[in-house]
């Protein structure tokens, strides 16, 4: 077992956390929850699984990690990149030493090991609901692993000593565990509203995960498409959820729209009026809640442009707080995806227009022939910009400072103007995606009318206001339904929420959808466009090199091409 090569090996070392006292550096890693024998309360262990989940998607040491799952696809383009995400669109640079690849692999196997320990502790006469919650997280982790890596080691028991003899198990074998875990979870988890906390795992969260997992499994065994439909239908028909189609919550009297209301801080939970929410991950602010805030989540700083670099702009909730502009939506999303009247493309949801908000701002500037901002006397005319005027960007601002962007992660905390961390809740699962999962399952079974019906439910919400002047706007018919239309609709509905890379890999469409991205030279710099993609290599990620090196007694083969 090599030590010191990467500092931490989640796969090999996760099985010995809390059981060994050697001084390998990975054991010095900060742990959010203890899974050793000194923890007797199973509920504390289950809460620990949630904190481990948060540690994955709330990581700040590699700020660009959020972008790894969006750039290099049809919907994402790089902004002011941090670095870890660059090989995910400059594919020729993607290798087995990428920090994002290693981090996700390690953290998923840590989550699996912790879940295995809970499952084992409840094996004889234990708490079925506790076992089910642990199985949910194990299924979540394995579903992500097989989607992104293909064949992976299957470990269903925790180990008290390090092992270096792992091999890769076939996807179908891992899928068997995912399936059985989710079947158990769907039967034994509490119903919505009955869990210890509204953010804890319930039956419908398991159903939603099962729907996604079964759709992936259906690509190799079509019988799973029916299982996907059957898994998610009770969420739709159970009467516990409804699509948000009217203003609600603490911002209802402010300018906005009902779709935007779902994603505003203090409006996201079911208890706050969001009856569309299935799983809203509660991101408690550690200023207000002891033990809150896992690391410093970077979603806002990725998705929100760096407006603070513009004269006349100050950080505020109305503009989403302080962003870094590391991640942009692609030209495909900006200019080719939405139809007229779609509320999901309103300025409250995809912000394209802004106004100078700094009190007392006034500045004389030049405007060039293209309408961009230049220095005074350097353009075709001069104008004086003032507070309340529409923002006019420089031509180069579109890569970092000012560009159309989704607002779902925006929020501003006046006690932290710098805004290093996301402090609002995370939208993980909601009813809008449930309809899309069922539409996909129905399409795969040849039921294009059923798929159109599901998508039209979403479009009835999206075009509700516009239909007052354009009746029938947004309606789709069965003959319009194919996998590309469904993927387009997922982008319209779930931009910045879904892991787009996972969606495209599980539908076997990554190679084709990349071609839609639309960001290309010379309009975009050569270091901001997708290059080097080879579907035979880059559809799957490389297994981290450190894992192969540590596994000296096994045959942990690398994916082809890496």
Regions found by a protein language model. Give the residues of each.
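Conserved, well-structured interaction surfaces
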Residues: 43-52, 57, 78-149, 165-176, ...
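Short coil/turn linking the two alpha-helices of tandem helical-hairpin repeats
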Residues: 146-153, 216-222, 446
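Long, intrinsically disordered, low-complexity segments
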Residues: 21-26, 75, 108-109, 177, ...
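Membrane-proximal, proline-rich intrinsically disordered regions
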Residues: 22-64, 549-562
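Flexible, polar/acidic helix-loop-strand segments at domain edges
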Residues: 318-430
């Amino acid at each position: 077992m090599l030590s010191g090569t990467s500092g931490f090996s989640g796969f090999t070392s996760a099985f010995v956390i809390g059981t060994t006292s050697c001084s390998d550096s990975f054991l010095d890693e900060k742990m959010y929850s203890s899974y050793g024998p000194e923890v007797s309360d199973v509920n504390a262990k289950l809460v620990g699984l949630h904190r481990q989940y948060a540690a994955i998607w709330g990581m700040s040491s590699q700020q660009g990690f959020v972008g790894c799952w969006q750039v290099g696809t049809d919907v994402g383009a790089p902004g002011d990149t941090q670095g870890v995400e660059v090989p995910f669109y400059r594919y020729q640079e993607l290798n087995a030493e990428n920090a994002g690849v290693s981090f996700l692999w390690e953290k998923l196997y840590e989550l699996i090991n912790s879940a295995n320990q809970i499952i084992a502790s409840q094996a004889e006469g234990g708490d079925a609901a506790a076992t089910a919650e642990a199985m949910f997280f194990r299924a979540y982790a394995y579903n992500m692993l097989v989607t992104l890596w293909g064949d992976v080691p299957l470990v269903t028991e925790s180990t008290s000593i390090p092992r270096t003899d792992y091999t890769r198990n076939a996807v179908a074998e891992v899928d068997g565990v995912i399936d059985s875990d989710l079947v158990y979870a769907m039967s034994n988890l509490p119903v919505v509203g009955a869990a210890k906390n509204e953010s804890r795992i319930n039956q419908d969260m398991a159903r939603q995960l099962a729907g996604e997992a079964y759709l992936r499994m259906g690509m190799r065994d079509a019988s799973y498409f029916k299982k996907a439909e059957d898994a998610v239908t009770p969420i739709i028909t159970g009467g516990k959820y409804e699509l948000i189609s009217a203003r609600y919550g603490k911002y209802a009297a402010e300018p906005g729209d009902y779709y935007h209301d779902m994603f505003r801080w203090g409006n996201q939970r079911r208890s706050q009026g969001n009856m569309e929410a299935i799983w809203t991950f509660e991101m408690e602010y550690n200023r207000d809640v002891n033990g809150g805030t896992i690391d410093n989540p970077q979603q806002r700083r990725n998705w929100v442009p760096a407006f603070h670099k513009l004269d006349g702009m100050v950080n505020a909730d109305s503009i989403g707080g302080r962003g870094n502009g590391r991640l942009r939506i692609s030209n495909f999303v900006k200019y080719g995806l939405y139809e007229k009247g779609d509320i999901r493309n309103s300025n409250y949801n995809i912000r394209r227009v802004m106004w100078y908000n700094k009190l007392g701002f006034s500045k004389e500037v030049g405007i060039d022939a293209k309408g961009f901002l230049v220095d005074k006397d350097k353009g075709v005319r001069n104008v004086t910009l003032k507070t309340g005027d529409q923002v006019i960007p420089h031509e180069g601002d579109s890569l970092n400072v000012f560009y159309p962007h989704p607002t779902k992660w925006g929020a501003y905390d006046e006690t932290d103007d710098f805004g290093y961390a996301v402090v609002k809740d995370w939208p993980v699962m909601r009813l809008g995606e449930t309809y899309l999962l069922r539409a996909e399952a129905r399409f795969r079974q040849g039921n294009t009318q059923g798929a159109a019906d599901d998508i039209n439910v979403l479009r009835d919400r999206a075009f509700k206001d516009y239909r007052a002047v354009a009746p029938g706007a947004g309606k789709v018919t069965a003959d319009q339904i194919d996998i590309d239309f469904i993927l387009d609709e997922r982008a319209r509905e779930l931009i910045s929420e879904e892991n787009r890379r996972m969606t495209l890999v599980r539908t076997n469409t990554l190679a084709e959808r990349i071609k839609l991205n639309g960001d290309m030279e010379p309009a975009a710099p050569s270091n901001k466009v997708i290059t080097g993609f080879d579907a035979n290599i880059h559809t799957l990620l490389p297994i981290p090199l450190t894992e192969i090196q540590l596994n000296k007694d096994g045959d942990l083969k690398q994916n082809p091409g890496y």
